[in-house]
Amino acid sequence: MTSEIQILQAALWSSMPDALRLQDRPSSWVTANKPGAKVDSFLEGPTMAPDGALWVVDIPYGRILRIAPDGTWTVMADYDGWPNGMRYRPDGTLCIADYKRGILRLDPQTGTITPLFEGYRSEGFKGCNDLWFAQDGTLFFTDQGQTGLHDPSGRVYRAGPDLSDLEVLLDTGPSPNGLVTNDAGTELYVAMTRSCEIWRMPLFATGTSKVGLFARVPAGRSGPDGLALDRLGNLYVCHASRGAVFVYNPHGDQIARIDC
């Protein structure tokens, strides 16, 4: 058990220019999720490009933005959707987890968006949240919708490297959100936002088994969101309402907190 938790302070790197903030554009997402509020953007899904640029999504306004290493912001796509998560696929294309439209593919050169998965066995998704590609190209994504402790029916899906054979790995999640695999591709970690937990899912060719609790995250107005692993196997857990990133070692002990 780690006895001392290191506290770090994050520094602001870049801020969205005022010219890109949408004050008066109608948004059904804002109406549904933040009624009466003035929301000029809601950024999610950060993913690093090979050239060092950072890509993010703007959920309420269906925008995909690129932030160059020098801090320059560019709108790369603007479409009818609620993009929530985004990752690079091994072939160099970007894939988006979209709450309204499912899993999409984005050509980063042209901004063209095409559907990959719009549902499962003639049933629509609840509302896709985030996605992850393992090193071999296997796709994992969460279908969060409005699930929570009152309705623990959120799903985690898997598709092969050729994006075929979509399967449900888990359908009992209380708001599955961010997810990440270990380098070996033998374990999947999933943030369960409403229960403030990180679940560990052993991975097998036939699915998963003995899914367990890896770590409990401090509760609050929200819960754990995006996840990342470093080369030492430490897990980084973003927590929006706490304004912090919690860091856990491979045994599930908290070793650090990054305040934002």
Language model regions located:
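Beta-strand-rich domains and repeat architectures in extracellular enzymes and scaffolds
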Residues: S14-R63
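A short loop-to-beta-strand structural motif that recurs across blades of beta-propeller domains
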Residues: R63-L65, G102-L104, G154-Y157, E197-W199, ...
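A short beta-strand motif characteristic of beta-propeller blades
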Residues: W29-G36, G71-A77, T114-R121, S164-L170, ...
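Loop/turn-rich, solvent-exposed surfaces of beta-rich toroidal or solenoidal domains
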Residues: E197, T208-V211, A215-D253
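Short, solvent-exposed loop/turn segments at conserved positions within beta-propeller repeat blades
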Residues: I59-P60, Y99, T147-G154, T193-C196, ...
